[in-house]
Amino acid sequence: MKKFFAIAVLAGSVVTTAHSSLLNLKSMVEAITHRNSILSFVGYGCYCGLGGRGHPMDEVDWCCHAHDCCYEKLFEQGCRPYVDHYDHRIENGTMIVCTELNETECDKQTCECDKSLTLCLKDHPYRNKYRGYFNVYCQGPTPNCSIYDPYPEEVTCGHGLPATPVST
């Protein structure tokens, strides 16, 4: 019985993950950047992947910091950006459209956060030296998310980088 329960829990988590925002983000990043999102970006610099600390290492790392802040704002609104599924499509291999099929505001905003990250990653040079970076080496003050406020009107969740990266 215990084995059955463990298998049922595992199967349930796999099914849930299969329809999650993280898989939406993965497909979005891979379609636009043409990089394997897990191998290229999880563990890049101080902020790409889980957690983050210190001063971002480069522009790509700033993109991930902005995305962390965007998700933080969603959590404050009661959203669950890691697990909420949203609908999007890629047009002409370069445009990301968060579709009208997104029913909740959380779905819409999560899609916009992920879209902003993806476009930011596309627009900045990838540096192999920050791939697999151990964030124990990340030093300096952690930038406050308030550097992205207010967000530009045309974009939700901090598209791009702050005009002048500010350490607080």
From Swiss-Prot:
Free-text comment on the cofactor: Binds 1 Ca(2+) ion per subunit.
CDD domains: PLA2c (cd00125)
Tissue distribution of the protein: Strongly expressed in testis.
Enzyme Commission identifier(s): 3.1.1.4
Reactions this protein catalyses: a 1,2-diacyl-sn-glycero-3-phosphocholine + H2O = a 1-acyl-sn-glycero-3-phosphocholine + a fatty acid + H(+); 1-hexadecanoyl-2-(9Z-octadecenoyl)-sn-glycero-3-phospho-(1'-sn-glycerol) + H2O = 1-hexadecanoyl-sn-glycero-3-phospho-(1'-sn-glycerol) + (9Z)-octadecenoate + H(+); 1-hexadecanoyl-2-(9Z,12Z-octadecadienoyl)-sn-glycero-3-phosphoethanolamine + H2O = 1-hexadecanoyl-sn-glycero-3-phosphoethanolamine + (9Z,12Z)-octadecadienoate + H(+); 1-hexadecanoyl-2-(5Z,8Z,11Z,14Z-eicosatetraenoyl)-sn-glycero-3-phosphoethanolamine + H2O = 1-hexadecanoyl-sn-glycero-3-phosphoethanolamine + (5Z,8Z,11Z,14Z)-eicosatetraenoate + H(+)
Topology of this chain in the membrane: Peripheral membrane protein
Domain of life, per lineage: Eukaryota
Region named Required for localization on the plasma membrane: 139-168
Glycosylation, residue list: 92, 102, 144
Disulfide cross-links: 46-138, 48-64, 63-120, 69-145, 70-113, 79-106, 98-111
InterPro entries reported in the protein's UniProt record: PLipase_A2 (IPR001211), PLipase_A2_dom (IPR016090), PLipase_A2_dom_sf (IPR036444), PLipase_A2_His_AS (IPR033113)
Cofactor: Ca(2+)
Signal peptide: 1-20
pH effects: Optimum pH is 6.0-7.0.
GO MF, any single term: phospholipase A2 activity
Compartments where found: Secreted; Cell membrane
Induction statement: Strongly up-regulated by lipopolysaccharide (LPS) in brain, heart, liver, colon and testis.
Entry's family note: Belongs to the phospholipase A2 family.
Function: Secretory calcium-dependent phospholipase A2 that primarily targets extracellular phospholipids. Hydrolyzes the ester bond of the fatty acyl group attached at the sn-2 position of phospholipids (phospholipase A2 activity), the catalytic efficiency decreasing in the following order: phosphatidylglycerols > phosphatidylethanolamines > phosphatidylcholines > phosphatidylserines. May play a role in lipid mediator production in inflammatory conditions, by providing arachidonic acid to downstream cyclooxygenases and lipoxygenases.
Protein name per the record: Group IIF secretory phospholipase A2
Gene: Pla2g2f
